[in-house]
Amino acid sequence: MIVNVIGAGLAGSEVAYNLGKRGIRVRLFEMRPKKMTEVHKTGYFAELVCSNSLKSEDITNAEGLLKAEMRLMGSITLEAAEKARVPSGKALAVDRNIFAKEVTEVIERLESVEIIREEVTEFDPEEGIWVVATGPATSDGLLPFLKKLLGDDLLFFFDAVSPIVTFESIDMECAFWGDRFGKGKDYINCPLTKEEYEEFWKALVEAEVIEMEDFDRKLLFERCQPIEEIARSGKDALRYGPLRPTGLVDPRTGKEPYAVVQLRREDKEGRFYSLVGFQTRLKWSEQKRVLRKIPCLRNAEIVRYGVMHRNVYINSPKLLDIFFRLKKHPNIFFAGQITGVEGYMESAASGIYVAYNVHRILKGLSPLKLPEETMMGALFSYIIEKVEGDLKPMYANFGLLPPLKVRVKDKFEKRKKLAERAIETMKKFLEENPW
């Protein structure tokens, strides 16, 4: 059977490579350079359109642990990155052109991979195996078909998310639980006095923002106004908008605070909370500085920064099973950022995971879920099984992993032990369930 892969980004390239090198026949569709996207510059596979950094290789960093697991499973992304590496301290940074050229040439040399430089605008869902790995820049030609396949309400244009912090880093001596007018206790509320609010407002309006390309601007601002833009419209704008205290009584004072920052739970276990109404395009360093002006968040650990950009992704918890297959069409897989993983390595890792299970299915075996003690397994489980409400894209972070059985106070030592457990778990899994 032929496996059809749409899109030769990081995820699609991993699928084609990991199947192709094992003799599985693959048709890899890539419309570039015949039809370019708004963000790509070349026709190479796995082109890095933003940063040239693939982040840390240190296993006590979540991105480093993710790479260690990917190397165990086999990754064209990391093999090519070694050949394109440029000096960057503990981080893995690459020469973009050398990197993308290497990925392209390796896949072109695989005899079982047929490369088709055409745009796919539709396909027969009942015929063969399909892997949709079209990324955040999915073509306008394919979108109508995907909407028809998935349903209009299940294909999102992702243009804004708020920062997400860990629950354990919120100062609950300062914050209080509650919903407006006493209608529940679903939200964490961070009260601000007049002086604290004005200090926060001043820091927000003076903070540096990320400049967006022209192609993004119309899409973003007609859909969702960043919190810093609301703040610039007037000193009290936030108090009558996302920070309004109406109906929220601080149990310590018996009164409504001057302003309130609300946090909403992001996962079933209650480990992550997002800041309500804090969609932003502030630089990441500025987000950290400004959020720490909020007393209850002075020590907040941000596991996902707020971002605003044009993106397309699907509501994976409703549409996909844990193997990234469409529930109503199990022969159609999705991989990469379109599934709701965020980041270069996360996207590539999802491609490896999909390739692994497609390979098992073609061998007549059942697909397998990766252990949740691994970073890959925890990330994919979060995306598919643990999100409450609508999915917001997530990247690798240690907060996703199940806690250690023994409490470790030192943060570095805790991450080291979590990483060691993850690597040993992945090694054992692959020994018992090889490709």
From Swiss-Prot:
Broad enzyme group: transferase
Record's keyword annotation contains tRNA processing: yes
Residues at which FAD binds: 7-12
Cofactor(s) in the UniProt record: FAD
Chemical reaction(s) catalysed: uridine(54) in tRNA + (6R)-5,10-methylene-5,6,7,8-tetrahydrofolate + NADH + H(+) = 5-methyluridine(54) in tRNA + (6S)-5,6,7,8-tetrahydrofolate + NAD(+); uridine(54) in tRNA + (6R)-5,10-methylene-5,6,7,8-tetrahydrofolate + NADPH + H(+) = 5-methyluridine(54) in tRNA + (6S)-5,6,7,8-tetrahydrofolate + NADP(+)
Subcellular location: Cytoplasm
One GO CC term, this protein: cytosol
Chief location of this protein within or outside the cell: cytoplasm
Protein's UniProt keywords contain Transmembrane: no
InterPro entries in alphabetical order: FAD/NAD-bd_sf, MnmG-rel, MnmG_N, TrmFO
Family: Belongs to the MnmG family. TrmFO subfamily.
Function description: Catalyzes the folate-dependent formation of 5-methyl-uridine at position 54 (M-5-U54) in all tRNAs.
The protein's name: Methylenetetrahydrofolate--tRNA-(uracil-5-)-methyltransferase TrmFO
Protein's organism: Thermotoga maritima (strain ATCC 43589 / DSM 3109 / JCM 10099 / NBRC 100826 / MSB8)
